[in-house]
C-alpha cells in the first residue's frame, strides 16, 4: 500500500517582517506526495531579503527550526532536506528529497 504524505506550506510572519512590510509569499500552498517523491517549496518577497528561516510544524506540536540561510551564503541542508537562497530573485527554495512519512507537516518561512 502506498503511503501518501501531505505537506502544507504556510507563512510564518516575524515581528521584524511586519515592521519592514516584507510579508513572504510561499508556493505551492499544499503538496501531496508519495513516499520517495521530491518536492520544492518556494518563499519569496518583493523586498530585499537578508535572511530566510525555515521551520516545520507537525499537527498539535510547536514549530521546529530547520535552518537559516543568510544573504551571500551557500546552499544548506541536512539529511534529505536542503534549501537555497537566490538573492537576485529574492527567493529561497526548500527541497524535500526522497520524502518520508516523517516529513509530513506544515512548512514555514520567515524573512528579514
From Swiss-Prot:
Alpha-beta TR is a heterodimer composed of an alpha and beta chain; disulfide-linked. The alpha-beta TR is associated with the transmembrane signaling CD3 coreceptor proteins to form the TR-CD3 (TcR or TCR). The assembly of alpha-beta TR heterodimers with CD3 occurs in the endoplasmic reticulum where a single alpha-beta TR heterodimer associates with one CD3D-CD3E heterodimer, one CD3G-CD3E heterodimer and one CD247 homodimer forming a stable octameric structure. CD3D-CD3E and CD3G-CD3E heterodimers preferentially associate with TR alpha and TR beta chains, respectively. Disulfide bonds join 43-109. V region of the variable domain of T cell receptor (TR) alpha chain that participates in the antigen recognition. Alpha-beta T cell receptors are antigen specific receptors which are essential to the immune response and are present on the cell surface of T lymphocytes. Recognize peptide-major histocompatibility (MH) (pMH) complexes that are displayed by antigen presenting cells (APC), a prerequisite for efficient T cell adaptive immunity against pathogens. One of its GO terms (cellular component) is T cell receptor complex. Pfam families: V-set. Residues 1-21 form the signal peptide. Residues 24-112 form the Ig-like domain. The gene is TRAV30. Keywords: Adaptive immunity, Cell membrane, Disulfide bond, Glycoprotein, Immunity, Immunoglobulin domain, Membrane, Receptor, Signal, T cell receptor. This is T cell receptor alpha variable 30. The keyword DNA repair does not apply. One of its GO terms (biological process) is adaptive immune response. InterPro entries: Ig-like_dom (IPR007110), Ig-like_dom_sf (IPR036179), Ig-like_fold (IPR013783), Ig_V-set (IPR013106), TCR_alpha_variable (IPR051896). Glycans are attached at residue 42. It comes from Homo sapiens. It is found in: Cell membrane.
Amino acid at each position: 500500500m502506498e503511503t501518501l504524505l501531505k505537506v502544507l506550506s504556510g507563512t510564518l510572519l516575524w515581528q521584524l517582517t511586519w515592521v519592514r512590510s516584507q510579508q513572504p509569499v510561499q508556493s505551492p500552498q499544499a503538496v501531496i506526495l508519495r513516499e520517495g517523491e521530491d518536492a520544492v517549496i518556494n518563499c519569496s518577497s518583493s523586498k530585499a531579503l537578508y535572511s530566510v528561516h525555515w521551520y516545520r510544524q507537525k499537527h498539535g506540536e510547536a514549530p521546529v527550526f530547520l535552518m537559516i540561510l543568510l544573504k551571500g551564503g551557500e546552499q544548506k541542508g541536512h539529511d534529505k532536506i536542503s534549501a537555497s537562497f537566490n538573492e537576485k530573485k529574492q527567493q529561497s527554495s526548500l527541497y524535500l528529497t526522497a520524502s518520508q512519512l516523517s516529513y509530513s507537516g506544515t512548512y514555514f518561512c520567515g524573512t528579514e
